[in-house]
């Protein structure tokens, strides 16, 4: 469960413009809402046993609040783990920066929280590149679970152009 908590934290990363940039891009939250599949990511110890992560990103009643349901398949035994979390928009100008927290006791006071940015996304919201603000950990999300190798290569080139470390890449989806 601890691994899944950090997986979610990692997955909540938010993206920016199509070209390499030091800033995140504007996000249309109505279009960002919905189901995403993690297809690529940087290596991190929290997610080392997980593959085929699925993220359901759903707006709550408040305009700046979201609920997340993250599902991950463990590589070792195929067991499915799930985690529920909350996200709050921290930059309402761009809507591209979020703070993730766990509900209940662990999330009190934001102690179990992490900031994530959307660094890049498709104009039609078919894919997004997410990372921590310092880009130390990053993720590529896609609306489709099955993505061609050509599409993966293209998205990884975009991530590389934004300064994401390709030496730590993990192919996780589809």
Where are these regions (language model features)?
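Bacterial N-terminal signal peptides
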Residues: 7-15
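A beta-rich soluble binding module of mature secreted/lumenal proteins
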Residues: 18-174
